[in-house]
Design a protein with these regions (language model features):
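Alpha-helical transmembrane segments of multi-pass membrane transport proteins
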Residues: 1-430
Length: 430
């Protein structure tokens, strides 16, 4: 166990020295495994990990869902989702903020990435809120928080990777994320209402739109609704696997963007390059995490931790609560995927030994990552917005994001205390 603790310390030290966490995990895992196991088997293990990761059929779901999200973003559907939501509730106080949450939920049902959702909705939702006189802390906070729905509402990249690493059914993970995802969207809208109640001037009412315009706005989003229903309905119904669903989704998004005239040769090239770049980054993290996981598993840390918790006689739910607290702390200083992959080799065996459902734990991890994404000082969504909105002080983004941590934390506690919120839908799957 001492070797593993030194390994974790080494990763944190290298991270503080500004080394990318993928390289830090890979280097520490490789050197640590070489010292405790020997260099020849370590070299063989590293080569096998790279080969297995690069050629794993199940992992092809990752680039395909990324490609689907990029095609949909290129087609401009985020604007239409926002306009459709605004058409119905924009005339209320805080209506544009509520519309932003709904648009983020809709875009998240296609995108699967929190950062991409936040970046896209910043371009779509911030200008009209700024024009109407919304307070910067509310407009930036609701976009940053709404962006986190991109990883909660399926399809979700982080759910896919969790499912692959822990060998948990991805379709059941997607089904488990539906109710908590919708609940989080509702809680964020409650957060908007609370902010408007405390500070009515922060979110002025917009113009009321008539029913003909509302019907026209709904007609504009039929394509995205159909795509989501086909992909997720097929996965939930067992018609095809998550990988096949991702392929169908990417193909459908391609033809949809093509039909809308959004795909020139230059645009297609940019979509493919961006998808390849994101995929390469994720695969680098996966390879490094697998090497580090091999090192941790070779030490006695997972078994020692399980034995220690058993001897202490702590309530199982308290143990999971302590793990979630660790994730909250790590989420303020680390990127979400790296944080999850770094801790899963230690936490997951303990959770399964305590008899908890891995699908439920996967949803909890995504929920706690949501909180980390908008928690100062290193919440990734906040810095994405800061990079796009140079005119808005970072302090205002921090202020707004911190307020929306509360609704997301409430959602986390509800799923922790009432597991059926996550497990009810998967119970109907074969």
């Amino acid at each position: 166990m001492t070797e593993a603790l030194l390994g974790f310390a080494g990763v944190f030290v290298l991270a503080l020295l500004r080394m990318p966490l993928a390289f830090a995990m890979g280097a520490v895992g490789f050197i640590g495994l070489g010292l405790v196991r020997g260099w020849q088997p370590t070299m063989a293990n590293a080569a096998q990990v790279v080969y297995d990761t690069g050629f794993a059929y199940t992992l092809s779901v990752v680039p395909l869902f990324i490609l689907m999200g990029n095609f949909v973003a290129r087609a401009g559907l985020a604007h239409e989702l926002f306009h459709a939501a605004y058409a119905f509730i924009g005339h209320l106080r805080g209506g544009l903020a509520h519309a932003t949450v709904l648009a983020c939920a809709g875009f998240g049902a296609i995108c699967g990435s929190s950062i991409a959702t936040a970046a896209t909705m910043t371009k779509v939702a911030y200008p009209p809120m700024k024009k109407l006189g919304y307070a910067d802390y509310l407009s930036t906070g609701v976009i940053a928080a709404g962006g986190t729905l991109g990883i909660m509402i399926p399809p979700s990249t982080i759910m896919v990777i969790y499912g692959i690493v822990t060998e948990t059914n991805i379709g059941k993970l997607f089904a488990a994320g539906v109710i908590p995802g919708l609940m989080c969207a509702g809680l964020l809208m409650c957060g908007v209402a609370w902010i408007i109640w405390r500070d009515p001037r922060s979110g002025p009412a917009g113009e009321r739109i008539g029913w003909p315009e509302r019907r026209a706005a709904l007609k504009q989003i039929w394509g995205v609704v159909l795509l989501v229903v086909i992909v997720l309905g097929g996965i939930y119904g067992g018609v095809f696997t998550a990988t096949e669903g991702a392929g169908i989704g990417a193909s459908g998004a391609f033809f949809f963007a093509l039909a809308r005239g959004a795909l020139t040769m230059k645009a297609l090239y940019e979509v493919l390059v961006e998808s390849a770049r994101t995929t390469a980054m994720l695969f680098a993290i996966l390879i490094a995490a697998s090497i580090f996981s091999s090192f941790v598993n070779f030490t006695s840390m997972p078994s020692d931790l399980k034995d220690g918790i058993t001897q202490l006689g702590l309530p199982p739910l308290a143990v999971v609560g302590a793990m979630l607290f660790v994730y909250v702390i790590l989420g303020t200083i680390m990127e979400e995927l790296t944080m999850v992959l770094l801790t899963l080799p230690v936490f997951f065996p303990v959770v399964t030994a305590l008899g908890f459902d891995p699908v439920w734990f996967g949803v909890l991890i995504v929920l706690v990552v949501q909180v980390g994404l908008i928690s100062p000082p290193v919440g990734m969504n906040m810095f994405v917005m800061n990079a796009l909105l140079k005119e808005v002080p970072l302090s205002q983004i921090f202020r707004g994001s911190s307020l929306f941590c509360i609704p997301l934390a409430v959602g986390l506690v509800l799923v922790l205390v009432f597991p059926q919120l996550a497990l009810w839908l998967p119970s109907f799957m074969k």
